[in-house]
Amino acid sequence: MVMRLGNTFEKIYDVVREIPVGRVATYGQVALLAGNPRWARVVGYALHVNPDPDGIPCYRVVNRSGRVSPAFAFGGENRQIALLEAEGVRVTDAYVDLKKYQWQPDLR
């Protein structure tokens, strides 16, 4: 079980590493790209225990409404907002406009 969970986390981290600067993805989107659309909560947990916050940009993941995490594990909501804004992502009242900033990976 631990090995399976480890492999799941690695898939999640691989997807999150692909989110470009200036873009965000939702937990559900990361779950789908990692192989299972039902993993949205697993994505949240994996990012909460992210072993490499500098190399795995978990701050680029928001909820399905575009809301940043009120409990961002690496400095709180204001830190997540600051990191996103430093990349040019506008955050208004803790929300990102998904129509403008959501990552649309080429799935070919």
Regions found by a protein language model. Give the residues of each.
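Nucleic acid-binding interface residues in structured DNA/RNA-binding domains
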Residues: 2-108
